[in-house]
Amino acid sequence: WPAPSGKKANAIALSAQTQDLLVSADYYVLTKRFSSKEERRRVVAAVYDPHRIASPLVGFENHLNYFHTGGNGLPEQMAKGLALYLNSSLFDCHFRLFSGHTQVNATDLRKMTYPSRDQLMRLGLHVQDRMPDQETIDKILERECEKP
């Protein structure tokens, strides 16, 4: 990596012009900006793990939204908990109530209600290397978000 490709660039060369396109390599939650009508959920979330790529900086493609705190990454457990919540059936139902289209823009995501910081951290404890399946996600959410 970067992979040789004649069609489209798949890496960013660090320079004064590209510096603003990059963020520190931390934990982030990524969501696709567009979903197809056939997809089970409108929002599909994943955790960016900075330990998988040895680089102090990272750039995300324009077709992704990324959750951050003041331009910096999130604590690992919070990122995992947020991704789990975004992948839940509950979040999908609420998102579809407020957004009838397949575009997932940052403004719509900001308007949504989220669990507390403590609840997100507890949710994150249930995510290891892989996101649990849908049924497990929903059970975890139901159990953990009953607690204040």
For each of these PLM feature ranges, what is it?
Residues W1-M131:
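Polybasic, glycine- and aromatic-enriched phosphate-binding surface used to engage nucleic acids
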